[in-house]
């Protein structure tokens, strides 16, 4: 397809604002799924996602929409809403030119609305504000539009008002995507360059690589090379997501799809790597991704010592589909051999634990979660401490620095006093306050001056 008729976009929002429901309605409206096959959260195929009603893993799907006499190919990436899975959102945005910013018109702008909007702005995406749940009696679209403008500096007076539950005005969202999201750049006739934005492991087919073709084209039986690892593979199967994997003969510049090459070694695929033709002209590597910053650490020990290697295999498999997970071997006098794992947050840790138990039948003991500390030694060197047992004696180091966070809090005005008190009790320092609407405000806090002097670690918002 001509790239000028392709649009790549994601849906971003705070948790429970209706992302997956809107994706369902888009699939229905474009005829991508037959009514008899339709079910809620169609793209959320992980058991834990359907059980909890949340999106954990980003999903891609290709749909077709007619506008102004032309048929457009829309590549949709449905992303998670919880802060612990922000890395999934960030990866997905690298494969897009636009983002639908979905806001619950009864709840208004919330924490992940702001965080995901900032990610979209940093990725230079065209942002389309959409107000959901306008069919509810307590919906307040005018106020929420004002909140979007005040907190994010985005024009929202013409934000589309929809009900993802009933499908009202979803067709207008599709039209707006075609109108405002730019067509993908790149050279359709140039040398192949494709970005790996995700990968999953299939027991029978091996690693399935998700890619966005930036330049050129990739065809079945092509021999391709990954610039980061230098590995060469033959594309045995490639295709698009509609929403199930549908094989095709090739993918062109601007398209999103997958390929299979009997890749069995999990470490051979790196999210953010660039794919080129093996015998083609030299190509420059595409910008990759920032390494995820692990905020929480915990140790996992198999209850049966014989399962040590099995736990390693399970963690390696999870690492392929979740590149924000990290682990390393660890030992304990009481618990034996296990693995110390790094997570983006407590929910991320809980999800990984449950996936190990359900998908890999692991019976294990988990230690209490902890954070990483930075240590300044007497000789001037710096290091990282992941557990109390790794802390040297006090006469060997000058400073022990704990993580800090600069926090923005969106809340109803009646809770300002109690929230400030809790913040102060936890060593927070009030910075400033902004009123987004008559009923909602934005508070900024940071660590107290004493803590800022103690620590020079990077902050997180």
Language-model features: where?
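Structural and coupling elements of P-loop NTPases
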Residues: 1-446, 450-452
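Positively charged, low-complexity/disordered segments
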Residues: 449-451, 455-461
């Amino acid at each position: 397809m001509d790239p000028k008729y392709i649009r790549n976009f994601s849906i971003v929002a705070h948790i429970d604002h209706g992302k997956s429901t809107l994706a369902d309605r888009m699939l229905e409206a474009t005829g991508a799924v037959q009514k008899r096959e339709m079910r809620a959260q169609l793209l959320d195929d992980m058991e834990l996602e359907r059980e909890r009603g949340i999106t954990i893993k980003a999903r891609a799907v290709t749909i077709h929409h007619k506008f102004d006499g032309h048929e457009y190919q829309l590549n949709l990436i449905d992303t998670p809403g919880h802060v612990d899975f922000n890395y999934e959102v960030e990866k997905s945005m690298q494969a897009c030119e636009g983002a639908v910013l979905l806001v619950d018109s009864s709840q208004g702008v919330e924490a992940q609305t702001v965080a995901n909007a900032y990610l979209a702005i940093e990725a230079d995406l065209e942002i389309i504000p959409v107000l959901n749940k306008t069919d509810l009696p307590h919906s307040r679209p005018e106020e929420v539009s004002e909140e979007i403008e005040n907190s994010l500096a985005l024009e929202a007076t013409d934000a589309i008002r929809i009900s993802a539950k009933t499908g009202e005005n979803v067709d207008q969202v599709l039209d707006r995507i075609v109108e405002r999201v730019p067509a993908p750049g790149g050279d359709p006739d140039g040398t192949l360059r494709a970005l790996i934005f995700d990968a999953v492991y299939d027991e029978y087919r091996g690693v399935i690589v998700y890619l966005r073709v930036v330049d050129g084209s990739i065809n079945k039986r092509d021999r391709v090379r990954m610039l980061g690892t230098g590995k060469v593979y033959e594309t045995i199967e490639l295709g698009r997501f509609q929403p199930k994997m549908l094989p095709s003969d090739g993918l062109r510049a601007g398209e999103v799809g997958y390929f299979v090459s009997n890749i069995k070694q999990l470490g051979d695929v790196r999210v953010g790597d660039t794919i080129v033709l093996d015998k083609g002209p030299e190509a420059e590597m595409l910008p990759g991704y920032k390494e995820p910053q692990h905020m929480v650490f915990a140790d996992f020990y198999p209850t049966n010592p014989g399962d040590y290697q099995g736990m390693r295999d399970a963690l390696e498999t999870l690492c392929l589909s979740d590149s924000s997970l990290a682990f390393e071997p660890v030992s304990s006098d009481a618990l034996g051999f296990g693995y110390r794992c790094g997570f983006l947050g407590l929910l991320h840790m809980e999800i990984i634990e449950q996936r190990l138990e359900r998908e890999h039948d692991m019976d294990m003991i988990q230690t209490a979660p902890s954070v990483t500390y930075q240590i300044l030694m007497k000789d001037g060197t710096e290091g990282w401490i992941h557990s109390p047992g790794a802390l040297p004696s006090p006469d060997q180091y000058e400073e022990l620095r704990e993580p800090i966070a600069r926090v923005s809090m969106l809340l109803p005005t009646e809770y300002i006093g109690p929230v400030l008190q809790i913040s102060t009790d936890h060593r927070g320092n009030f910075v400033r306050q902004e009123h987004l609407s008559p009923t909602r405000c934005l508070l900024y806090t940071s660590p107290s001056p004493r803590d800022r002097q103690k620590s020079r670690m990077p902050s997180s918002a």
